[in-house]
UniProtKB/Swiss-Prot annotation:
Cofactor annotation: Zn(2+)
Pfam families per UniProt: PTS_EIIA_1 (PF00358), PTS_EIIB (PF00367), PTS_EIIC (PF02378)
Keyword Cell membrane attached: yes
Domain PTS EIIC type-1: 1-371
Protein name: PTS system N-acetylglucosamine-specific EIICBA component
Gene: nagE
């Protein structure tokens, strides 16, 4: 494993112990005198912070092991006790903090991966296999204790001096941290930097004589000087990035805003409430790197200004509105936090103006502004089912070069972190067709595939697929073609009509280019028109044969007597509803007449749960004919109103 790959994997392993912090902070906060004033609740939260290094040892060991094993977690705990207790007998001043937990966790996880299947002689067989792992870890950590007892004091001094320099640098130090923090997001290494800043740098001793290290620990212990590595994130995550999302919405052409609006709104609300910004950042990180660089600079400026103004705020998870409300009046620690709201309004305006100007000035390809020839056709796949997820995982394995090229699989919140033999063999286009928003090739062996919130599920499914046997790489011929716009065929004068369709749906006509799905809107699926339904019955638009009804009953394909293939697709992304809201009234292979009922819908349910109920009705093989003539407009009635005419 190369150095970059190691630190990427370490960043993933750190997420498990960090995930317990919100619970600890909630308990500690609600137990305070100004809220519930219940000491045992506060102590419960404090206990987690007091034993954070041990929690890191357990969490890192489990995450580093090949199958998240409990034996590895136990080994991490054993190693931690051996290392910390043995080391101080050599030098009582040694205090490794969470770094001791991280190191022993790595030793425990590595020992498990190496020796969990070890076979010992019969008289020692009880101690073989997984039972051997804590024993081996304890031995190795004893050796480390003997080494670190002499080696660590100068390292500890260097870390302390570096931390003191950053703290003494004040606003400049926090600004540099904020800038580098955002720059490391694409590589995933920000978790390593955060761990040092939030759990190691700085020292605070409370009235009881307990020593706390790191910005988060010191903040929740009541250190009024803590927060320089946290405060400035609140204006960015709660206000700045939502301002960027609004700018990207208005920068998109008007006809495409409905397609990107829902997505931008959801990621902006997520950033505001929880401080989880990666889904929003990844929308422009790869499409417009210049914007991401400006975002990193603005983040650094925000941390710089917050420190300069004497603002001291903290969080347990991230800088969202939920954490802001919890820490707003935390005794002794929170100071001037109201100013973050003022900063937030200012940064909202800055992000909106800067993003708006830069996007238009440099014609950046933010969501909704992509060139038609760059848009990728995405297949409709239901990854909510086990079968669908397995197929998606198999496709991703093929896209990255097959099992021969794939060496290691890991995942975090939004990314598949993959180690490959040769990143040049990765099919970026196929990855994007499968739903990835970007592929990052960090070096020849390390890549990241940005797949969104289902990254961990997809990663787990990929591991299961690999365990079952080899998967071939996707062939060059299998590379999906980009969705070049399909020119609308023009009906030849005096051409013969081969099909006159009636509307299959009662509702209001919507032009095809207004459908909130690029595959339909670009006419890549076929030409036709769409309808926003107002009645529950879907009928056949012409006489012919039902050649296909999707198993989720949300769409069907009709072949007319003259060979026109008509696709009636009820709603957008309704496949994700797994058939709920739809009932088929005929079966595949049925001979039907125009106006015969095919599907019945629960419109109340569908309108509440579907992304959109705008329903395309297209001729998928329109290239076989001279064109079509749209006849419908306004409000139309199923089985009665002429929809369009196909000409030979």
């Amino acid at each position: 494993m190369n150095i970059l790959g190691f630190f990427q994997r370490l960043g993933r392993a750190l997420q498990l112990p960090i995930a317990v912090l919100p619970v600890a902070a909630l308990l500690l906060r609600f137990g305070q005198p100004d809220l519930l004033n219940v000491a045992f609740i506060a102590q419960a939260g404090g206990a987690i912070f007091d034993n954070l290094a041990l929690i890191f040892a357990i969490g890192v060991a489990s995450s580093w092991s090949k199958d998240s094993a409990g034996a590895a977690a136990l080994a991490g705990a054993v190693g931690y006790f051996v290392l910390t207790k043995a080391m101080v007998t050599i030098n009582p001043e040694i205090n490794m903090g969470v770094l001791a937990g991280i190191i022993t966790g790595l030793v425990g996880g590595a020992a498990y991966n190496r020796w969990s299947d070890i076979k010992l002689p019969d008289f020692l067989s009880f101690f073989g296999g997984k039972r051997f792992v804590p024993i081996a870890t304890g031995f190795f950590c004893l050796v480390l204790a003997a080494i670190f007892g002499y080696v660590w004091p100068p390292v500890q001094h260097a870390i302390h001096a570096g931390g003191e320099w950053i703290v003494s640098a004040g606003a400049l130090g926090s600004g540099i941290f904020g800038f580098i923090n955002r720059l490391l997001i694409p590589t995933g290494l920000h978790q390593v930097l955060n761990t040092i800043a939030w759990f190691q740098i700085g020292e605070f001793t409370n009235a009881a004589g307990t020593v706390f290290h790191g910005d988060i620990n010191r903040f929740y212990a009541g250190d009024g000087t803590a927060g320089m590595f946290m405060s400035g994130f609140f204006p960015i995550m709660m206000f700045g990035l939502p301002g960027a999302a609004l700018a990207m919405y208005f920068a998109a052409p008007k006809e495409r805003r409905p397609m990107v609006g829902g997505m931008l709104l959801s990621v902006a609300v997520t950033a505001f409430l929880t401080g989880v910004t990666e889904p929003l950042e990844f929308l422009f990180m790869f499409l417009a790197p210049l914007l991401y660089l400006l975002h990193a600079l603005l983040t650094g400026i925000s941390l710089f200004v917050a420190t300069l103004l004497g603002i001291h705020a903290g969080f347990s998870f991230s800088a969202g509105a939920i954490d802001y409300a919890l820490m707003y009046n935390l005794p002794a620690a929170s100071q001037n936090v109201w100013m973050l709201l003022v900063m937030g309004v200012i940064f909202f305006a800055i992000y909106f103006v800067v993003f708006s100007l830069v996007i238009r000035m440099f014609n950046l390809k933010t969501p909704g502004r992509e060139d038609k020839e760059d848009e990728i056709v995405t297949e409709e796949a239901n990854s909510n089912t086990e079968e669908g997820l397995t197929q998606l995982a198999t496709n991703y394995i093929a896209a990255v070069g097959g099992t021969d090229n794939l060496k290691a699989i890991d995942a975090c919140i939004t990314r598949l972190r993959l180690t490959v033999a040769d990143s040049a063999r990765v099919n970026d286009t196929m990855c994007k067709r499968l739903g990835a928003s970007g592929v990052v090739k960090l070096n020849k062996q390390t890549i990241q595939v940005i797949v969104g919130a289902k990254a961990e599920s997809i990663g787990d499914a990929m591991k299961k697929v690999v365990a079952r046997g080899p998967v071939a790489a996707a062939s060059a011929e299998a590379t999906p073609a980009t969705a070049a716009p399909v020119a609308k065929p023009q009906a030849v004068p005096n051409a013969v009509s081969i099909a006159e369709l009636v509307s299959p749906i009662t509702g209001d006509v919507v032009a095809l280019d207004q459908v909130p799905d690029e595959a339909f809107a670009s006419k890549a699926v076929g030409d036709g028109v769409a309808v926003k339904p107002t009645d529950k019955i879907v009928v056949s638009p012409a006489a012919g044969t039902i050649v296909k009804i999707f198993n989720t009953n949300h769409a069907f394909c009709l072949e007319t007597e003259k060979g026109a293939e008509i696709v009636v697709h009820m709603g957008i992304d309704t496949v994700a509803l797994e058939g709920k809201g739809f009932k088929r009234l005929v079966e595949e292979g049925a001979q039907v007449s125009a106006g015969q009922p095919i599907l019945e819908m629960d419109l109340d349910y569908l309108n509440a749960n579907a992304r959109s109920m705008i329903s395309p009705v297209v001729c998928s093989n329109i290239d076989d004919f001279s064109g079509l003539i749209i006849k419908a407009q306004g409000h139309i009635v199923a089985g009665q109103t002429p929809l369009y005419e196909i000409k030979k």
